[in-house]
Amino acid sequence: MQSATEFLKPRIVEVDRASPLHAKVIMEPFERGYGHTLGNALRRILLSSMVGYAPTEVAISGVVHEYSTIEGVQEDVVDILLNLKGIAFKMHGKAEAILKVSKSGEGVVTAGDIEVGHDIEVLNPDHVIAHLTKGGKLDMEIKIEAGRGYQPATARKVSEETRAVGSILVDASFSPVRRVAYAVESARVEQRTDLDRLVIDIETNGVVEPEEAVRTAARILVSQLSVFADLEGTPAESESPRSPQVDPLLLRPVDDLELTVRSANCLKAENIYFIGDLIQRSETELLRTPNLGRKSLNEIKDVLASKGLSLGMKLENWPPAGLERP
């Protein structure tokens, strides 16, 4: 028998899969009101915080701006860019990649025509990009990046020095969740009939399975709320101030990143000895480094991404006191 002050926890979790991309996740019982409290929080996280992959920059041969038309191609550039946004990409161990499409002659250009490596998947290869007429030709380079939520092109700062000539910035919708809704129904436990059943109806693009998306959203919510469970009072004035804590990963030498000898030597020549030094540099700054080109830069970015880091990060209190440089 449950006491009057004890909170119910969901004991039943059911997954009803309509397809590999569409499922309903049903959880019960919840105390009255908790279905809406948790359902709304999970829905917002699912829509805004799932990691996905999207085109962010496109360069089309012979095209200067997005309002152009291409001879021999039925769609104009705006339509081609919209079609590219509908492709579901999945990358393994990479934060960004440059993909190419090259096709000529009458026919349909689909996502399956994109040249990808072993570490990149196109999950909907039949998705149509454009239609070519007789004598038509389409050559493109597509930059794919990892991200979360929606990011308009105007919000991304891309240096003109590193941006390819004729490339077009694209509004990026990274979220792998196409649609999510929740409903709260009545549930019953023994004599109690005022409880909630939470039903989350979710559809993804295949980059992440519906159930895994819900699990990830729940972990994010728990992580964000856990800080409130450890609230402490304001330290007394007599206590000595604590020195800022620095992530031990940032104190490791760049040699630990296992970069090529060329890349590592270029960094050290710029007095970049620690990972904390490196992540504060921007792409533009690194490209100004003698003998460090785009290939080395991409290598550095991929290695940092595998550790949850990126270039251009801001660190307070760096370097920490007592840090000895070679």
Curated annotation (Swiss-Prot):
Coiled coil feature spans: none
EC number(s) from the headed UniProt entry: 2.7.7.6
InterPro entries: DNA-dir_RNA_pol_insert, DNA-dir_RNA_pol_RpoA/D/Rpb3, DNA-dir_RpoA, RBP11-like, RNAP_asu_C, RNApol_insert_sf
Enzyme class: transferase
GO cellular component terms, semicolon-separated: cytoplasm; DNA-directed RNA polymerase complex
Region described as Alpha N-terminal domain (alpha-NTD): 1-232
Keyword Ion transport: no
GO molecular function terms listed in the Swiss-Prot or TrEMBL record: DNA binding; DNA-directed RNA polymerase activity; protein dimerization activity
A Pfam short name: RNA_pol_L
Record field: catalytic activity: RNA(n) + a ribonucleoside 5'-triphosphate = RNA(n+1) + diphosphate
Subunit structure: Homodimer. The RNAP catalytic core consists of 2 alpha, 1 beta, 1 beta' and 1 omega subunit. When a sigma factor is associated with the core the holoenzyme is formed, which can initiate transcription.
UniProt record similarity statement: Belongs to the RNA polymerase alpha chain family.
Domain notes: The N-terminal domain is essential for RNAP assembly and basal transcription, whereas the C-terminal domain is involved in interaction with transcriptional regulators and with upstream promoter elements.
Listed name of the protein: DNA-directed RNA polymerase subunit alpha
Organism encoding this protein: Thiobacillus denitrificans (strain ATCC 25259 / T1)
Gene this chain is encoded by: rpoA
